[in-house]
Amino acid sequence: MVAAGLGVVPVSARDAVLARAARLGTGSREVLDVAALIGARVELDLLESVTGCPPAAVDEVLGSGLLAGDGGWLRFRHEIARLAVARAVPAHRRPGMHARILAGLGLLGCSDDARMAFHAEAAGDQPAVLHHAPRAARRAAGLGAHREAAAQFERALRCAAADPNVAAGLYDGLAHELRVVGRYRDAVEAGEQALGLWRQAGDRVREGDTLRNLSYALLSMGRGPDVVAAAEAAVTVLEPLGPTAELARAYARLAAARMLFSEHLAAIELAMRAQAIAEPLGALDALSDALSTQGCSLARTGGEGTGHIRRALDVALSAGLDSEVGRAFSNLYYVYASQRRFAEAERYFTDGVGYCDEHDLDTYTAHLRGERALALERTGRWDEAVALSTEQLAGTDLSSLYRLCPLHVLGVIRARRGEPGAWEFLDEAAAVADACGEPTWIIPVRLARAEAFWLHGAPRLAAQEAERADDVAAGSDGWERGAVAAWLRRTGSPRPPRGELAGPYRRQAASEWAAAARAWDSLGCPYEAALALHDTSDEAALRQALELFTGLGAPAAAQITRHKMRQLGIRSIPAGPRTATRAHPLGLTRREREVLELICAGHSNAEIAATLVLSTRTVDHHVSAVLAKLGAPSRSAAAAHAARLGLVGAAEDRQHRS
């Protein structure tokens, strides 16, 4: 149903419609006006009940061509016609007509609360709005239509006659729905309204639960200290009241807050407390949340936490808990991707975004897309990372917290490519991360800034940024500690590594550069592999690093590598791809041209790797770059395009001359 007043009606169309309507008799015009206010499809028995007009009046309207019959229904032939008629109904008559429609729907046993709430509001019937709108909101939320749910709560709150207790409950519901759909500032305002009203009413249970919900909304605003304060206050209010579902939710929320500040042992203990209360009470939302948090903290302390998060997802899916489903998908993708288990992460991104888009879970969609951009950056798919990050930042309603990943990605890739504007992104990212106060956000942003300074030839400033990351890394996982250790060493900081390091970082800390590079390559992280090779003094490794940087389109790191090679007295250093690349009609590097020639010859990636003495991971990256530069969706399309441009023949001529 489209509410009257929405949409644009061209003047010419309006005049044509109203000219037809003016030719109707009085009773028939009443039928037309009521039909326009009912909606796009009109039950014939409802229309007759509301207007009391004889069938002849309906026949006259049908004869005008504005309405058409459809069994027991009537419908406007064009929505523009309905809008034109509805807007022409005099304002003083509309409330009475909507009141009659509302009464007619009631007599017919209408169970559509959203429809009833619409007509009740238009009729000025506040008790009816307060009856139907909250019911419509809860039904919409249960169906995953969270924007509609928020709109219905807002409709109910427009009734000034609502008593404080009723209003408090409505604000609570609204705050939750607004947070889910990404309207964070409005969610905080609604939560604060609810909190004041519950305190005024002296309802401690609802006060505590509202504080817990408010903590969620504050999290999405990037207000880290306030997140913890609200969660702690919720527990303080609810603990004296005994083991309730509300207390289980509060423990789960405080556990999540502790996790975000890298207090993982406390987070795990609180999550287990929440589960002990939630499971016997059947508080499945609290159970899912607690399992999700416990899994994340276990993963970040060296344990295998994904099993807990998968159980959290199963619990939420089976109970139809949209918000908890979105959180579990987001956490699964984050954990797998942060551990560089990209193949395992992929399904949770695809399934998660699909679910979140379908259920209006904008908060978790934003989180998934941000983490996806980081994964694309880590795997050398920079064009895709830039495209996704740019698309995210174009969203006007994205909160500061969910701007962090795209800001980080765009800043660091611009720095690597030697493009202008890197600091614009990295400065904003640092401001947001520092305000949030969470190590999970501070560390990657400070390391991105360390890299940017290093690439710009400012090692002292780079070391300072790496040390700022190290300052908050005590509770981080081995991957974050490893990244911090690598940049401390690379930038010349005297600080030693903290604790156990994960994956290839252990090899780097032990100066096993070749092994580290192979490990990065096996994980699909070509830029990290190149950095590991750069950190050695071995000529062959440095040449390989230079080739990788060049192939990735990272001229700043390539130039630093050339400078290091010159300092080591290495001769015959490749000057870079610029002249050859510019001469090539598609801008392919030398290695990419070799890969293209072998693609055209029908070689598989494994065969190309054997021919060029490269790893299959490196070849995968080169093939992706070639397809992108040719604008080809497949290898066969790339070969056909190269043949049309005459590139294959040129390759064969060189082979025959050699």
Spans of model-derived segments:
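Short secondary-structure boundary elements
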Residues: 1-163, 173, 471-479, 485-487, ...
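Amphipathic alpha-helical segments of tetratricopeptide repeats
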Residues: 63, 137-138, 154-158, 192-202, ...
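Helix-turn-helix DNA-binding segment
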Residues: 524, 563-566, 575-633, 637-658
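Repeat-based scaffolding regions
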Residues: 93-216, 229-238, 508, 515-521, ...
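Tandem amphipathic alpha-helical repeat scaffolds
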Residues: 84, 135-141, 169-182, 206-224, ...
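Inward-facing hydrophobic residues that define packing positions of alpha-helical scaffold repeats
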Residues: 58, 98, 102, 120, ...
